[in-house]
Amino acid sequence: MNKKLTDYVIDLVEILNKQQKQVFWGIFDILSMVVSIIVSYILFYGLINPAPVDYIIYTSLAFLFYQLMIGFWGLNASISRYSKITDFMKIFFGVTASSILSYSICYAFLPLFSIRFIFLFILLSTFLILLPRITWQLIYSKRKKGSGDGEHRRTFLIGAGDGGALFMDSYQHPTSELELVGILDKDSKKKGQKLGGIPVLGSYDDLPELAKRHQIERVIVAIPSLDPSEYERILQMCNKLGVKCYKMPKVETVVQGLHQAGTGFQKIDITDLLGRQEIRLDESRLGAELTGKTILVTGAGGSIGSEICRQVSRFNPERIVLLGHGENSIYLVYHELIRKFQGIDYVPVIADIQDYDRLLQVFEQYKPAIVYHAAAHKHVPMMERNPKEAFKNNIRGTYNVAKAVDEAKVPKMVMISTDKAVNPPNVMGATKRVAELIVTGFNQRSQSTYCAVRFGNVLGSRGSVIPVFERQIAEGGPVTVTDFRMTRYFMTIPEASRLVIHAGAYAKDGEVFILDMGKPVKIYDLAKKMVLLSGHTESEIPIVEVGIRPGEKLYEELLVSTELVDNQVMDKIFVGKVNVMPLEAIDKKIEEFRTLSGDELKQAIIAFANQTTHVE
């Protein structure tokens, strides 16, 4: 396909990050002002210029004030495929106000300008600054429509409150794929009102009738606090109608400018139907913990490890060392991070935590302030079949990391544990319990600070049931559940990662931090919601019970009764009272495990882990 020059320009600017776009438009704007003052002078006075320095001063002042004003309005990185008429008006007022302010200052010291000259300068500057932005918007819109992506779909918006108003604020621009036909709201009394010129047609109870009448193809939910049962009801109605259902992006991402409410709509996901509200934690003390520091993450290519890297990057550390055994996953997260965040030195390191000498060499070379230990084998049935690998990675590997932290004098280590470490009947949980003992044991004798963070299942991680259910649904079913009674605690990947980072900030003396994760979720209910999300019914995608697998528990626990204490470091985060064992005793036990294999090793690790779970 032959590309035009405009296509290449659009592609080039689209790959720029926010700071680069600011520089791009800043350079263009100052050139526009320079050209404007030259043209204004030629038109007003002819070609003779008696005082060029004065005009340089005036242009510099005008540009400075203009940048301050559009920066205040958040337009200094404006690429106009998202611009609205109000943005163009702000640019006009910015040029006018900055020009008059500069004129007032210059007139007091350099009374060379007439007000008519300034008026001409304002008109030319505004024209030259707005012209490329408007042209950009028109070209981008034309390309979208020409590609076939710009086909407008007849759409209902659900929500006539604050969320709906935020959606409408950015809905009207040329790249929108929507033809917004009407708005529905839970409150039927709003019927007949208008929001952004679009009528409220009724309650979303009327969705089936109204969708057929208006030939609706898409529904977008713009109620941030919508109850999960209401989400399910809307989804069920949409599925019966054959209508696609989406949601508006999170309000905070819209306010921060990360998404456009009226265009960046998203698929409804399982977190919306589970109704678990993500815990928002106080980040005030994290700056001192992370900013300007070197941070090392083991297992940086995994679901949790990579998200820890993203979360830590928000606090502008000097360097993040991405340590992992899988070169492909480290490669992917490395390139994602350098694309998203600037000014941080990302160092990809391929290393195995079972290789102590390599770990120590990396730790001594980069001298991290904190090590987040996310590397582990986490799949319960796989570890039941491979107990030796679980021992080598989860126990020996954690020991190596903790020992290297001590030897390299790293100030702090945060280890990720699991609720499966509580009364573990399986190898994976037992090895993570022993890993907790290793961390608390090193904390007793080392100058470094160690802690562990214990939480439940993570939605969407590579080891969770979500990808399995998605694959089974895509294949036409059935969806397999081991036991319809089975329950698990769930949290999102970002939430789990935030907990890990906060635990590091509060760690003082070998604590095991435990999150209050709310109510457990039935895996059977989770499967039903996944089928609903796919647009199918249980008659189309059956859910079958296949029996519990080796090492699985019906119900997970976050802590045993003897571990529960009232010590709450912050909302929803507790410190568990856990048993501590001298490191010498742990060393002896690890040497014993090294000589065992197969079922003998499995039973020995599980027995030892359960002996040490209860506080004496």
Give a label for each model feature.
Residues 45-49, 139-255, 328-332, 339, ...:
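A solvent-exposed beta-alpha-beta segment
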Residues 211, 215-217, 317-318, 363, ...:
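Proline-aspartate-enriched helix->loop->beta-strand connector
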Residues 258-271, 275-367:
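N-terminal Rossmann/SDR dinucleotide-binding element
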Residues 21, 280, 285-289, 441-457, ...:
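Strand-loop microenvironment adjacent to phosphate/nucleotide-handling motifs in alpha/beta enzyme folds
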Residues 241, 256-257, 373, 377-436, ...:
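Conserved Rossmann-fold NAD(P)-dependent oxidoreductase catalytic core, especially the SDR/UDP-sugar
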Residues 1-150, 240, 247, 371:
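Signature of alpha-helical transmembrane segments in polytopic membrane proteins
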Residues 2-7, 231-294, 406:
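Flexible, Lys/Arg-rich cytosolic regulatory linkers and terminal tails that connect or flank
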Residues 348, 390, 450-453:
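Hydrophobic/aromatic anchor residues within beta-strands of the central parallel beta-sheet
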